[in-house]
Amino acid sequence: MAVPKKKTSKGKRNQRHATWKGKAAVAAEKALSIGKSVLTGRAQGFVYPMNETSEEEAD
């Protein structure tokens, strides 16, 4: 069975943790930006379903 030979240092652990947290922060910022653009109606980079109930009620 494979086992690590030595304990990972706190510095290496913190470095990996910081990388993970940084990637999560970038993803969260991007999601927030996309959400804001959808709410303001300025989203042009993707297609999302519109509410069809309002069109049916108008007819």
UniProtKB/Swiss-Prot annotation:
Residues 1-22 are annotated as: Disordered. GO terms for molecular function: structural constituent of ribosome. InterPro entries: Ribosomal_bL32, Ribosomal_bL32_plant/cyanobact, Ribosomal_zn-bd. GO terms for biological process: translation. Residues 1-20 have a biased composition (Basic residues). Gene3D superfamilies: Single helix bin (1.20.5.640). Keywords: Ribonucleoprotein, Ribosomal protein. Pfam families: Ribosomal_L32p. The keyword Acyltransferase does not apply. GO terms for cellular component: large ribosomal subunit. HAMAP family: Ribosomal_bL32 (MF_00340). Belongs to the bacterial ribosomal protein bL32 family. This is Large ribosomal subunit protein bL32. It comes from Prochlorococcus marinus (strain NATL2A).
